Amino acid sequence: IFMKQIFRIPTDKSYMVAPGQSIIITNSAIDHTQTAMNAFEHNLLNADFEAKDQQGKTTNNPDVPALELVYTAYAAISNMNLSQGGPGGIVIFETEEDVANWPLAYNYGKTSGNKWMKLPAKYILDGVDVLKNNAQTGVDANLKRLYDYIDAGYANINAANGYNGEVMYRKVQSTTEDGRKILSDTNNSLSDFAISSEIAPREFK
């Protein structure tokens, strides 16, 4: 899998996520309700990790641990380069290898330009394909970036460009007797994810 960026949760200590719990990873761990004019912004002061902007264009929170940047294809971009509305693929992987030594490659058929890091697919634990919803033609499934065995479907928001408060969230499949939420994981994001403009960080439904 060709990756434009790879981040790692810090290895200075063990960061365990208990069953039914979650972590928040953001580019800017601030109270966005105080800085934005949009009612759909959230307070992210309690985020668990933050992708720090080494160029200083994004406001960072020194009290939130830094997400470790392992690789970026763009010298001027050190935080998470996510496209509002898509397209893009996001994966979680685990390996004991030295990721920094993985090979780099140009785009297929190219001999210049940005280089992508080659992630062995065998290390991928989960992934979601995020596709753009074109206002005129809808979602083009031919633009999927992940293999079907990682994500047989895709997720998308309704808006074409984002910035309208819509988020994609993984749906609750069931709830245990003690109240713990078990999330849907069929390896098909069309079934596993839904869209909301009201759900809050760390909220499940």
Predicted regions and their residues:
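A recurrent domain-boundary module in secreted/ectodomain proteins
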Residues: 183-205
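Solvent-exposed beta-edge/loop recognition patches
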Residues: 2-184, 188-189
